[in-house]
Amino acid sequence: MANQGQRVQWGVDITKKRGLSNSRGRKNNTIPLSFFNPITLQQGSKFWNLCPRDFVPKGIGNKDQQIGYWNRQSRYRMVKGQRKELPERWFFYYLGTGPHADAKFKDRIDGVVWVAKDGAMNKPTTLGNRGANNESKALKFDGKVPGEFQLEVNQSRDNSRSPSQSRSQSRNRSQSRGRQQSNNKKDDSVEQAVLAALKKLGVDTEKQQQRSRSKSKERSNSKTRDTTPKNENKHTWKRTAGKGDVTKFYGARSSSANFGDSDLVANGNGAKHYPQLAECVPSVSSILFGSYWTAKEDGDQIEVTFTHKYHLPKDDPKTGQFLQQINAYARPSEVAKEQRQRKARSKSAERVEQEVVPDALTENYTDVFDDTQVEIIDEVTN
């Protein structure tokens, strides 16, 4: 192993081995948070056989600090009383940080795969760990990502509250319940005195409450506001697509109107991915001030044409969704296959969300991805 402070050189390929853990899990310790979203490994695959040795995420640290390790998180859920193993998740930490902050580069640790960019310094980084209130970053890499690696994305924080948080809240409630019960008796007597005083002054609180309930009921029975776009008497270029078939406004897909697959055209802005697609479209001011405009007479109308060029980031998932919609009408069988694959991935993701993690191993994190590990047994894995 290189000495402390030397630069990493991958001139000689080191055979990947699995070693012994220094402990029997991190059951009672707080697991530091990774800066990045995790990778979910395809079941049956071995991370250390697939992971490139320079597989360091982009976006944090300088060139000397592009060194660290991937740390395994084993997962399972209970199905009819039986334990069912779920695909492993792997979290990245920089050298000198995370659950193995004291480990040296290439130390043999079960559940750890070491990686580094060529030329990185073989010494602990000063990057630290992610704060509990900070969101994890999307994974981006210079090279190709193995097909068995699924790069996870952030979801709603509402689902990230752990059982430990609930237990803490439960304790607080039980401690305050006794005080509340004693205070309730005092509050009742004060309320009765106030009501009696108001009645003497001619204020009938009971009638006021009835009127308030009546108004509330009227509001709840009122019709739901109609959000359907009003397109009558509007030019085609001023119409807004609602939920439903858009061909009645914009016509069938053709060489001059080549955006949208069958699902998007049939559902309009009710299509599942419409919000993500809309984010890839330039704003009105961008089109107005950043386009090349021409105009010519066309009978009793003026034909206006504009050309607008802009760039979308290649590594943004929304860009891929957007590109799939271009000329989709011309390749229906290919689009249908892509849609079936998306549905299959969506169903797989829903099943993963049903996973159960034991209370004793769940940490209190603010992000949907926590780095909690189940106990890792000290065995050599071939």
Swiss-Prot record:
Domain CoV N CTD per the UniProt entry, residue ranges: 224-337
Region (RNA-binding): 33-159
Keywords assigned by UniProt, alphabetized: ADP-ribosylation, Host Golgi apparatus, Phosphoprotein, Ribonucleoprotein, RNA-binding, Transcription, Transcription regulation, Viral nucleoprotein, Virion
Region annotation (Dimerization) ranges: 231-334
Positions of the UniProt region annotated as Disordered: 152-240, 331-355
Residue ranges with Low complexity bias: 154-183
CC terms in the record's Gene Ontology section: host cell endoplasmic reticulum-Golgi intermediate compartment; host cell Golgi apparatus; ribonucleoprotein complex; viral nucleocapsid
Chief location category: virion
Subunit structure: Homooligomer. Both monomeric and oligomeric forms interact with RNA. Interacts with protein M. Interacts with NSP3; this interaction serves to tether the genome to the newly translated replicase-transcriptase complex at a very early stage of infection.
Protein family according to the UniProt entry: Belongs to the alphacoronavirus nucleocapsid protein family.
Protein name: Nucleoprotein
Naturally occurring in which organism (per UniProt): Canine coronavirus (strain K378) (CCoV)
